[in-house]
Amino acid sequence: MSVLNTDLAKQLGAETLGARLWRIQPGQASTNHRHRHSAEIYLLLEGTGKLRVDGELVELGPLDSVLVEPGSVRQPFNDTDEDQLWLVVGAPVEPANTLEMDEATLAFIYPDGPKALPPELS
């Protein structure tokens, strides 16, 4: 999986929330993952997109958004022929260093493994 990722929060010095721009190219997906404490807003800026939340498929057009609560499994993906541009904002910030996580935490965050593709791209 290859998602072009810009960390806006880091660039702006934000410490209490995360904000990223994701460009998801055709046939690509973000990781299927969840956060223990962070809620995230997924705003599709360009393209048409799909986001699976707890097994349910949500289809979005430009400027559509979805709020994903903590604990929910989420995965945006691109099964179209055009790039998608997403703005993802979440709080509170959670550690993202998977190298320091134990097996149980990794299994919670990535229930299908960190490289699982959605069925639409498999």
Describe the role of every protein-language-model region.
Residues 45, 52-54, 61, 77, ...:
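Beta-strand residues in well-ordered beta-sheet regions across diverse protein folds
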Residues 13-15, 25-28, 48-50, 57, ...:
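Short, charged/polar surface micro-motifs in flexible loops or helix N-caps
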Residues 55-71:
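Short acidic-glycine-tyrosine-enriched beta hairpin
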Residues 77-122:
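Double-stranded beta-helix
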Residues 1-32, 38:
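A short glycine-rich, His/Asp/Glu-containing loop-to-beta-strand
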Residues 21-25, 34-52, 89-92:
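Short, conserved beta-strand element in jelly-roll/cupin
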Residues 37-38, 56, 72-73, 82, ...:
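A generic "binding-loop/recognition-motif" signal
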Residues 32, 51, 68, 74-80:
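Short beta-strand His + acidic residue motifs that chelate non-heme Fe in jelly-roll/DSBH
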